[in-house]
């Protein structure tokens, strides 16, 4: 479809089919549309609200242009949509280390900060992890440690085509929805934190159509008007579980899993160096209990969707064991040490 045809269809309030959206996104990624046209398309899609077919079409386009990486298909991604503006520390990154210490393979897809002070890539760098490790070295890191961080700009170079337009628009677009569902390793097991509960059903349908094996979509309450793209230790958490082709809805409280109920302010983070120190303190057991509980909750769900735990309670036991035995701390140190060694090896090979 030509740019004008897509614009006219969206102006009239019509949805695009999966194929139309994939074709449209291909044109955007390949700079075949004008900047003004691309901006208008993104704004109109946002005003209308993206359908599952449109999201799947956009995903198909971006994934087809992504840099491939081969990891264990049982690996789990822990990520969130961002956008909650609560200023919490990097809960899902801390949880990834705890779960990995419990023997769960992790393939975390992430980026630098967009809506927060500190994205997953930022905090990993502050911990000493080189996020731009080439895919072949990342595969080796995963084989040695069971952990890989997939830095979005490295694996999705086509996204650069819209970076300036997105920044100039200054509004949420369909691209804000795509991060959690375009993991370049093609993971089938995920914990996805969703800031906007109105899009949870869209994510659920997209994940099922994309062949998800076991995933949990979570939206946490903070006890006030703010929401979290994390499971919450501040109030109830709404969950949509996707397992064996079924959609199951839950609402849970932190007390259901032996966790405390905390004020959102007790989960506050800061810049990348502050958040890196928080993660170290969680893993060595010296952090305030509120922060430990938040990381344990996300790790417990990660263990559950991995298949290693039969329920979240069992995932909690595995996660607590990972902390208490220092397996999580040892695993993080091993991951960073191995990452640095492989990065140095790659640098030496190019000199």
From Swiss-Prot:
**Record: residues binding anthranilate 1:** 80, 111
- Taking the record's annotation, the residue ranges forming a coiled coil are none
Tell me the residue numbers annotated for binding 5-phospho-alpha-D-ribose 1-diphosphate: 80, 83-84, 88, 90-93, 108-116, 120
The UniProt record gives the binding positions of Mg(2+) 2 as 229-230
What cofactor requirement does the entry state?
Answer: Mg(2+)
Pathway(s) per entry: Amino-acid biosynthesis; L-tryptophan biosynthesis; L-tryptophan from chorismate: step 2/5
Recorded GO cellular component terms are:
cytosol
Q: Which InterPro entries match?
A: Anthranilate_Pribosyl_Tfrase (IPR005940), Glycosyl_Trfase_fam3 (IPR000312), Glycosyl_Trfase_fam3_N_dom (IPR017459), Glycosyl_Trfase_fam3_N_dom_sf (IPR036320), Nuc_phospho_transferase (IPR035902)
Q: Pfam families recorded for this chain?
A: Glycos_trans_3N, Glycos_transf_3
Signal peptide segment: none
Enzyme Commission number: 2.4.2.18
What terms describe the molecular function in GO for this protein? anthranilate phosphoribosyltransferase activity; magnesium ion binding
The superkingdom of the source organism is Bacteria
A Gene Ontology biological process in which this protein takes part is: L-tryptophan biosynthetic process
Positions that bind Mg(2+) 1: 92, 230
What protein is this chain from? Anthranilate phosphoribosyltransferase
> Which organism is the protein's source?
Chlorobaculum tepidum (strain ATCC 49652 / DSM 12025 / NBRC 103806 / TLS) (Chlorobium tepidum)
The lineage, from the top, is: Bacteria, Pseudomonadati, Chlorobiota, Chlorobiia, Chlorobiales
